[in-house]
């Protein structure tokens, strides 16, 4: 009994030390990488010359790669972590990709950055407006031309119809900047992290997912057109740490990450005017919902297999 108690206490102490180390490491890496990116972003703003813009953008992408390497060290603080990754074949840093993914946790961004950093161009995320105010990180993301999306409720849009379509315009402006060099645009199309509360509030018909929001990726496809080489449909989960994967990651208790990558061609019928063409909008939503149904079945299979193993 005493041995079990001592083991429990030591495990808690080790988790607390790992948590502290992880937080300090994350802050230091973020500051070290974001400050040069912010300075470069200011240079890009003051000198909007195409040649300078391209060189500065490449430098910013390099610093983001360094940030991803720092996050990889963070994952190494999880000594029992096992990766199960399927579908990385055929990827290239010379291509343009649209990456869509389910969203379970803050850990998702760390996983995507670390996993894909050597396989595809640097990820550019669709971000919530609130993240713009996070010290260092917000300005760095702005310098990297990541679009900040401001979500409005249906009731708010009814009172302020002039706000309708603002996110779409933000997407269009950001995507125009990605034409000049290979880019991976990442969109968590659920618009928010999955929780049971949000699942009930949105009346989701999916078991493991929130309903997908189609406007952002539809606009990205419309602006960049055939410049996108492929669609990366990514499904990820943390079967052993499903309740709080990000906290478990920081505490060194993350044990298993499962990632399925489905590389798909982008059909011509997915390019169109999502805002004004109701027929296209309906077709696009049906296509995205069908992807989400497949993703939901895959997640159910992964989670049920884990329960059986236990």
From Swiss-Prot:
Family (UniProt): Belongs to the 1-acyl-sn-glycerol-3-phosphate acyltransferase family.
Catalyzed reactions: a 1-acyl-sn-glycero-3-phosphate + an acyl-CoA = a 1,2-diacyl-sn-glycero-3-phosphate + CoA
Residue ranges that the UniProt entry lists as topological domain Periplasmic: 1-20
Null mutant phenotype: The amount of cis-vaccenoyl group (18:1) linked to the sn-2 position significantly decreases in the deletion mutant. Loss of the gene does not affect cell growth or morphology, but leads to increased fliC expression, enhanced flagellar formation and enhanced swimming motility in the liquid medium.
TM segment ranges: 21-43
Protein name according to UniProt: 1-acylglycerol-3-phosphate O-acyltransferase YihG
Cytoplasmic-facing ranges: 44-310
Domains as described in the record: The HXXXXD motif is essential for acyltransferase activity and may constitute the binding site for the phosphate moiety of the glycerol-3-phosphate.
Protein keywords: Acyltransferase, Cell inner membrane, Cell membrane, Lipid biosynthesis, Lipid metabolism, Membrane, Phospholipid biosynthesis, Phospholipid metabolism, Transferase, Transmembrane, Transmembrane helix
Function of the protein: Acyltransferase involved in the biosynthesis of membrane phospholipids. It introduces a cis-vaccenoyl group (18:1) into the sn-2 position of phospholipids. Overproduction of YihG facilitates the synthesis of phospholipids containing a myristoyl group (14:0) and a cis-vaccenoyl group at the sn-2 position, and a cis-vaccenoyl group at the sn-1 position. May affect flagellar formation through modulation of the fatty acyl composition of membrane phospholipids.
Gene Ontology, cellular component aspect: plasma membrane
Pathway given in the UniProt record: Phospholipid metabolism
Membrane topology label: Single-pass membrane protein
Miscellaneous comment in the UniProt entry for this protein: Overexpression of the gene in E.coli carrying a temperature-sensitive mutation in plsC allows its growth at non-permissive temperatures.
Coiled-coil region(s): none
Subcellular location: Cell inner membrane
